[in-house]
Amino acid sequence: MVLCFPLLLLLLVLWGPVCLLHAWPKHLTRAHWFEIQHIQPSPLQCNRAMSGINNYTQHCKHQNTFRHDSFQNVAAVCDLLSIICKNRQHNCHQSSKPVNMTDCRLTSGKYPQCRHSAAAQYKFFIIACDPPQKSDPPYKLVPVHLDSIL
């Protein structure tokens, strides 16, 4: 039993940063946080676009992809055939056509002085969708997670 406590403590220390990477601000719904992180109707310079996300999380996010489309169009992907997500859940959906995106990657700096580079992309994407919460738009399903870019 004495050996279990240090092992448990080590697991908690290692798990903490992983949990923070996938957390979202609790005053936002998952769909609203998805919109903030991944929908930018017209391209913005990455440092400016990422500052909004970094201000919520209080750290420099290493990588983020913005779709240049409306929330309504991205949410429409949730109505397409469901597929298996990376986490083995069955609530993912693939876009039927590629869309313009900007991939932002951290190049230097520490919060709040984060610096990101930009790469334009035209690709398909896979999103996870869930039923909306009370304050979400009234769609049958709403996007809550960017699962992958193809």
From Swiss-Prot:
Signal peptide: 1-23
GO biological process, one term: defense response to Gram-negative bacterium
Site residues, Critical for catalytic activity: 61
Protein residues bound to substrate: 61-65, 86, 105
Entry annotated with the keyword Lipid metabolism: no
EC number(s) reported in the record: 3.1.27.-
Positions annotated with a glycan in the UniProt record: 55, 100
Site features described as Facilitates cleavage of polynucleotide substrates, chain residue numbers: 59
Gene Ontology annotations for the cellular component aspect, listed alphabetically: extracellular space; lysosome
Protein location: Secreted; Lysosome; Cytoplasmic granule
Subunit-structure text: Interacts (via N-terminus) with bacterial lipopolysaccharide (LPS).
Recorded family membership: Belongs to the pancreatic ribonuclease family.
Protein known as: Ribonuclease K6
Organism placement in taxonomy: Eukaryota, Metazoa, Chordata, Craniata, Vertebrata
